Design a protein with these regions (language model features):
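Conserved lysine of the Walker
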Residues: 35
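P-loop NTPase "switch/coupling" elements that transmit nucleotide state to mechanical/effector output
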Residues: 1-30, 40-171
């Protein structure tokens, strides 16, 4: 399937997110099967953009359209890595500019009020798809990678990207 075909299948879920529903898009498969490519795509090749860049574009475009009828949205993003049973914030302070990881506060998964959250995980306000792309690049640069027998560029970790939308209608 092409990246466009894959996104066509998940696009209704992205719209549901803008409509106020919680949505999870999950890529699962064997090492080397294309999970990272499906989600991130190939930077610089418009036709090979992945689910995340296409979803961001759809969300920001829809938010701009809905502004005409009184809706405003605030977006924020976080990037969490799970590697060797440890949680790591892929966007420590200044990561966008420096491209370096620092030793963050201890991260742990918590459950409260029907929500799953990670205290101390940095959440960055995002205003457009290009800014999100830069943040994703910064997160990718500090992600754990190592060759395996199946894939010489394996990420060797699980990567959770979270986009939070808060929508309000003034009418």
């Amino acid at each position: 399937s092409s990246q466009a075909q894959v996104f066509a299948d998940v696009s209704p879920f992205v719209q549901s997110c803008v409509d106020g529903y919680k949505v999870c898009i999950f890529a699962y498969g064997q090492t080397g099967s294309g999970k990272t490519f499906t989600m991130e795509g190939l930077r610089g090749d418009y036709d090979k953009r992945g689910v995340v860049p296409r979803a961001a574009e759809q969300m920001f475009t829809t938010a701009a359209e809905l502004k005409l009828i009184g809706w405003t949205y605030e977006f924020s993003a976080s990037f969490l890595e799970i590697y060797n049973d440890e949680l790591r914030d892929l966007l420590p302070a200044g990561a966008e500019a420096k491209g370096k990881a620092s030793v963050p506060a201890k991260l742990d998964i918590k459950h409260a009020g029907g929500e799953v959250h990670v205290p101390n995980l940095r959440s960055v306000p995002v205003t457009d798809a290009e800014q999100l792309s830069r943040l994703m690049d910064a997160a990718t640069r500090v992600r754990a990678t190592s060759a395996t027998k199946m894939n010489e560029h394996s990420s060797r970790s699980h990567y959770i990207f979270r986009m939070r939308l808060v929508g309000k209608n003034s009418k």
